[in-house]
């Protein structure tokens, strides 16, 4: 995990976690090629990572993912996916599973 997930050249970008490592040739978080799973950050993926990291004793990393996810949605609104470099929202507006951020907020409040 430390070698890849926390690597700023792969997954640990300003608004983690991209669906493809930033070091991959096909990384396209700006959605230029209209390939949605080639780099954007998705809240449903962050939600799964958050709970998995907490379950395995990495609450510190989970909290960072939650904090950056909350900031990203606060900045760009409820969108389908986000650019992991800028936090800009892309795709559909008011996308349902992005409301999983509410679960992250509640979980973070319960651990504070």
State where each predicted segment sits.
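Extended, well-ordered alpha-helical scaffold segments
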Residues: 1-8, 57-72
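Generic helix N-cap/helix-start motif at coil->alpha-helix transitions
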Residues: 42-46
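Well-ordered alpha-helical scaffold segments within catalytic/enzyme domains
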Residues: 47-59, 101-112
């Amino acid at each position: 995990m430390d070698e890849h997930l926390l690597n700023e050249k792969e997954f640990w970008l300003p608004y983690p976690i991209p669906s493809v490592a930033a070091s991959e040739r096909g990384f396209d978080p700006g959605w230029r090629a209209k390939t949605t799973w080639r780099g954007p950050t998705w809240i449903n993926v962050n939600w799964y990572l958050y709970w998995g990291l907490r379950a395995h004793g990495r609450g510190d990393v989970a909290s960072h993912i939650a904090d950056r996810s909350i900031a990203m949605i606060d900045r760009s609104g409820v969108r389908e996916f986000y650019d992991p470099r800028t936090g800009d929202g892309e795709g559909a507006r008011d996308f349902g599973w992005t409301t999983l951020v509410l679960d992250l907020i509640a979980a973070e409040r319960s651990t504070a």
